[in-house]
Curated annotation (Swiss-Prot):
Lineage of the organism: Eukaryota, Fungi, Dikarya, Ascomycota, Saccharomycotina
Start-end of Basic and acidic residues biased regions: 1419-1450, 1495-1547
Keywords noted in UniProt: Membrane, Vacuole
Protein name, entry field: Vacuolar membrane-associated protein IML1
Subcellular location: Vacuole membrane
Amino acid sequence: MASCATVCLPTCGTRLSGHSRSRSVWKLVSYITLLHFILKVFLVFLTSFHLLTQLSIKSGNLLSSLGVAARSQVQIKLRKKEQVEADLVEICFKETYLTRADMWQITTMLRESCVYHQKRIVFCDVIRCWVDSIFKNGRKVFSAYIGPNTNIVFRSESSRMIIIIQLSQETWHFEETGEIIFHRMVNSLLPDIFKQWEENEHHHTVTIVLFTSVSMDSHAVKLKRGEKAKDVQDFYRVVCDQVQLSQWEQIMVRLRFEFQNFAKEVLTESHAKSHTEIRGRILPSVKSNILGAITLAASLVHSPAIDRDLRRTNVEVIVVSPGSGVYEVEYDALYRASEKISSTEVGVDIICMSKAPLHVTPLFLYKPKKCSNQLEYCVPSWIDISYYGDSDFFTNQWVPRCKIYEIQMMGVMENELSAITIDYLNKPSGKKPLSEYCREYDASLFGPIAVELSVEDAASVVSKMRSDTFPKLPVKQLLSSKGSISSLHAPTAVTSKTPPPKASVKVADVRPSPAASKPRVSALTSLLAFGVRAEKSAPASPALSAVNTLSSIQSMDLRRDNDSVKRDTESIVTDDTVHNTKAEPRITEIAPIAPSLPFAPNLKPKKSTSTLSQSPTYNRIAATPDQEVERRSSLSQKVQMGLSGSPLDHRGKVAKAASANAKSINTETTPEKRNMMWRNIRTPSNISQDEMLDILTYSRWRTVYPQKTKRRSAKWKLLASPAALPLRTNIFPTVAELQTEYRFQVYDVSLDTDMENVLGIHGLFREMVSVRLCKGFQLAIGSRVRHVESQRSDGRPSAITTDIGKDALGAVVYLTTGDQVHRISCDYSGMMNVQIYHAIDKVDIEEPVFDIYARRTYSDKFKHFIFPPFDTSSKRLNWNLYDHSLAGYDTAGSAATQTRLNQLRVVLIPSFLSRSKNLGHDDSSEVYNAEEVRLDGLRRILGGIYRHSISRDEDKERAKIAPNLKFYTGELEDFLFQIVESNPAELAGGRDSLFMKRNQRFDKNIKLAQLATELQAPKGGIRFFDRRWHWKSYPHCFIGQDFVEWLIDNYSDIDTPDEAVAYGNELMKKDFFVHVEDRHAFLDGHYFYQLKSEYATEATDSKPAEEKSGWFNSKRSMASVSSEKSLGRFKGSRNQSVQSFGDFLSLSRVTSRSSNDQKEEEINPITVEISKSVRVDLDPSKKSYRPETVLIHHDRIHNPRKCFHLRFEWANTTPKFIEDYISGLTRTCERYGLKLVELPILEVSALLEHNPFASEITLDMPTLDQLSGLPPHVLEYYASDPHAIAREILHHFGFVIDTLSMSDWKLAEVQIRNSWGVPTYKYSQWVEKNGLLIAQVVGDQIIMIPNNLQLNRQSGAQSNAIQLQSEAQGIILEMQYLMCRSEKVRDMLGKVNLSPEASPGTMTPGEEGSKNGTPKLAIEAKMEGRVESPQVEWREDVEIAPEVEHKGGADGDENDEEGDEKSEEGDKGESENENAGMGMEQDGENENENENENENSKDNKANETTSEVKEVPAGVEIEHKEHVEEDKSDGPEPKKEDKGKEVEDDK
């Protein structure tokens, strides 16, 4: 059996020589315990060798941390695990998003092991963290054992910090040192924080917001305590949002500037140029809306606008307040804010700049609804507070805390001249003078005392006994003046099952009990006794009575120590049995009792059991003499202390609560539910130690700090590395609460048979717990959980666990959050049972909205905003559906919609290509230009995605083949109809590129004539159609990737794409088909080929010659085509439901006939799914303990002028695997001239609606009147399209279209949808080519926001972060400068000449104004003075092809490293080639492969491009701002037979 051993090392590393191995030497050397380890096998005979035994330590950080020389003498001692078990272990990590599920698994891995300081921990070979601190008994130790009671806290050194600086009245006050409080914030506090981040290399992102509350009441009235100001408005000034640490010096400058102007901006209102009015006044911190600021910051975590940052963990809200930690709040706001924040994982901390007061903090004052005139004090459990600048002098010695600013600011000569009045202290009403207390005390000792105790007082005692702590009551409440006791009797009690009317208890005839023969100590005792019953029994009224003397005490231990009273193991005394004791009790007649409590406290007598008898008219309670003697001395001392005015012992709560008001009686559930969010206290200045411990421990965050931590001191550990929400908690409702305050739901989950080998029962149990931990649940532990489980009929408290072992059968796990309790159990048959308790919200409180005035980072004035309240997603999540999805059941994709807890979206944009152009093909003689390199890069990405795809189909190998991408230029509808017209057989729904039924009818011995016939057959062949691409038309051609797929599906001896490509090259050698320009061999991709004339049949699907020659004249928009023509395109193609559209479309159309037998058909729109989803295994090497999968959505139809989209969705996957996968994608994209940019899920307008702190840049568009100098036909175009100017400006600054608006997808006969849902963007969205900015055109404005996701992803080094931020701000300033000067806009638009006959070659399809064939502008691509290197923008006519075989792709593409080294360093740029239809991607900025600058010919002059190329039709002149070399070798002249077919591109 394993034991725990301790290594004791010499304090100074003493080394003993060989001849001094005697016992005397052992005594001279002092040892300290440094290292603990698990000794699995300890052999006794090893001790006989004494000093000959050697201990070896592996090299590494442990050896260096010990600092012990080799061959030093050590001692090894066996220790019990409990002796060396740590209380708290802190584990730190950085640069990764670590979910709480992964924290749970790391905690399970470390259980029953020993750790030491700076020990490195590797989890799943991808997550790396280290042990930062180990605490035992409140002190740091070097090493310890992690046992079942050890709390493990995870701290992140890369978090998101939200700093809210409260600018209240006190902010402008001077301190005693003469420094303004705000200057102390920005000169001391914030620099200290940022300096720690920089020294420890922490990578936090910080958001700084200035906040204040302003009262708009014109009458300046001094607000009293508890009085709220009228017409209060909250102002927020966003200084910076999610910036890096490297810019903290600029932040300090910005903060000082904003502080100087903040008061002026919020207090003044300009009505005219010469009239400015001062309005309102800034409120002090105690009157400010601090809850609104905290809730608004916490809402960012659960906002729909939140995007998962894979490099940062935890969100910490830090409120810097000039006050002392006291705030007046409204009850409704306190309740809702506490409820919401208690259900989140956000840490909230307040740093006060003033000195710590002498009372408990943070202190919230509120008026309850039932008593609106009475203030109550409470300490919230979800806020931590600290005070900056308090030295040991202030903590160890008393200094005045009272601050009267008017007196402090007086001069020496002003003391006698100024009339400063200070209100007298309010004399407490109802309090007695000290002399009266003395008289009452004397009367209690030397004379009979009359006290009448009502049943309400007794019921209050019962209520107080049910709680864990008892508040201190004033001494006056101990002496009730309601009546008198004329004589005392022995105690009696009765329990009544029916609640009788209310009555009081009167006791007479004082007689000493037999046990009271000794001298009397005190004559005053008023303890109450009550019946005890089980929770399952019916509610009964407690029996109450008074006792006669101190000696006749009821059988109840006043001390209620944990050793004597344990609520979970106590015995239950029923009211059915009666046992009389030796003392003869006097019978007291008592009237029926009114108050009724459902459950009496379960208290157990210490020595003997008092028994209760039932009687309708009297009660009997008896006590043994032993009990009376035992409690005599201790009780008399407590009573004397209470009468003399000294504080009572905090354990003796019964006597103090005897006369509590009956109105304060609550059920068992109300205080407990409230205490989960805050603790009410009666006297903040005189709080007991127990109450303070309850405040510190009764919180979800109570295990974050070690024992004996000073609560008020500045916690630099928290500011440097915020802690994640602890995994375990002891907060749990009682049985009565679960029965009355919660709704119940139960269901069973069984594992799918297909998942048994993949996941297993143990894995399913673990995943169900893990996903709840990720949603903010905590593992419930403690006595309450065991007690609740024991009350179940089939309860097994011993089966409750927090660590799921390999044998999960029979285990039970409880998880809890603010409003839910989940019980997950696994029976011995493998069935998972889930029981969910939803808290019933009985409080009638409306959800508050955020009605604020905010000024964002780039705004110039405050604007009024109304943000909706946030809600935790755990309430909305369908746990039943989600758990079944984890078990392998996903019917109709419904579970997939519910389980998308985390989403991430990236796009691919062309970038500068400076590396090798090796595509990895076998034929090294092929020459590829930059566009083809990017084409192949996209193919490799898709190939890598599908290489590790997960499929349940029988043919799993085919599922790993990437699907074909479809590219189009022009209108999307025209492209879809072209596919249908070219091959109507695709509408039959029997063809699918991925899972098509194999028809292996042929082999390689087929005759060429037969092969040509089969290829061109209407059914079963491939598509032959006239392809128009980049001003040219190629008749009767097919695409290489279609032919590869057809060969694999129809040839019995061809199974892979490589075999298909090799066979295709053999056919080319036999002159079966050729490349349309004889430039390439047969390749798998978007390359055009034509059959030889002897094998080609008549192109029946080709359009007439007159239509070919007039492409732009015949081009129609579906929005303008009549319904007859539109329906005619599909007439006769199909009259039944359509299930698939080719190999990439998902179509559905319903055809029906009218009842009057008419021939007219009613056709519903076709549904086209333009994207496809695939589930990918991110851990093919099986490093993780579970399957690591992610659902990836990718485009199937793509316009090269737009971004190529990838969307990642996962529920319970380790984020580090996703981050590594995206990093591999990024490296692959860089090799092939593509840039991976991470974008938010929501559009810009939606982000601004949900995130009040988001940076917003608004640019007003110039009007047509300001552009009056432009040619008439240009003005006519801009008048017809209101968004054309905005599009041209965005193109000018290098923006690329990201996603079209929802209205652009609403086509006449086609309904567009994605694999993740229907498009929901209200406006078209653009992204800057480097991913720094995102823009939308809303009305007559351009709205932009910084892309913080991409900025934070690329900001690895500080220099890089500064460069990216500067570049983004440079673009913003240039755009603002341009928009402020209409003549600059006019000059920019005037540089492009547009002839009326010119084709709109550069207009993006689907955008506003592109439906009618209206001429559109082609803009110049060079942006003045900003681009340092040739830049790229995707054009509308770019071809990108997929890849079937992946050589690295997302996994790193290690095979291409050798080829990448062959890059030509002399490449400066690449020309655009107009022949992309022959396998060359036209993306608008082609870097030159070879330097042939001097070989430019007139035939290729139209192909010259700048760094950002926009295709320009004939007759359009472009003023070049940058010399770009043209590569003549990239595009030879078209063949003579094709020159006559050159036409202008449609788009």
